[in-house]
Amino acid sequence: MSVRRTLITISAVSLAVVAGVLIAPKIGEVGHTWTRVSAGDKTWLLAAVGLEVLSFVGYVVLFRAVFVRTESRIDWRESYQITMAGLADTRLLAAGGAGGVALTAWALKRSGMNGRTVTQRMTSFLVILYGVYMAALFVDGAGLATGLFGVHASAAVTIVPAAFGGIVIVSALLMARLRPVSVAPAAAGDERGFRRRARHITLSIAAGVRGALELLRRREVGLVGAIAWWGFDIAVLWASFHAFGAAPPVAAIVMGYFVGTLANTLPLPGGVGGVDGGMIGAFLAFGVDPATAVLAVLSYRAIAFWLPTLPGLVAYFQLRRTVGDWKAEDAAVEPEPVPVAAPARVAIA
């Protein structure tokens, strides 16, 4: 396990443990949780389902804006299959979405996109998606810390997230200035494996950031899909709160959502336990009623986990069939080898 991965895991586990310590004394107040979840306001819960569908639509729109820029085999049907299969993989395996990224890259390569383009566009896709994430952490955290949103909470859920988001954004913009440098063959051979991989990853991220900035400069309309993806998913949590009573201020919901989803980096099935505990712990820090927080988060997680998972599994098998069709098409158009006549022998008298 890499140092970065170890640090992320330690941080996420710590967050879940702290959240558990905060929640444990309150569990008795929740009572029959699952019974109460099923007794939530059906209108608000149905609205939450609709909002989650809109979140998926935003994801597909962003996917097409980044990956499908010219004539391509990937139409809306294939875009749906790739994104839904990737989302199901992410929900089931968590681990920061690594499984979904790998599946998406596999499908793109099978469509005929070369590996370098897949890597660059995948990095740009993630930069745009998580750029919105970090910007929300910074803006919401700064607004909460300064009292701009009229909500008061500890620095752990205001200043710290804002600082983290700001540092990541600035670091990404600085990395965009990095360019590949020619390395002499001898020097390249002497470069250690870890250092070589680190340089490759850094330059790949830098290229991805530049690609994302180029899409922004071109005012690519489809980039609003990133805002729709996060915004409508947060709205699902907001609707879930309303299903069980009053919702806390929007600024608190946004921060609780993003702090909780940091636990999705844990290699747990669907992030079970980590995300739930992180979100509930954050809402307790904002003074939200413990019983309402638990019910709202459990309802949100049920909708956000199962709604893409079942269709996503179906989409995965559809995608396998689509990839098989692509392979058959490629085989059909490959030119047959032309037999080369053997050189004529010349008899010398």
Can you say where each PLM-predicted feature lies in the sequence?
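Predominantly cytoplasmic-facing regulatory/coupling regions of multi-pass membrane proteins
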Residues: 1-84, 143, 147-264, 295, ...
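Transmembrane helix-loop junction
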Residues: 68-69, 91, 110, 242-243, ...
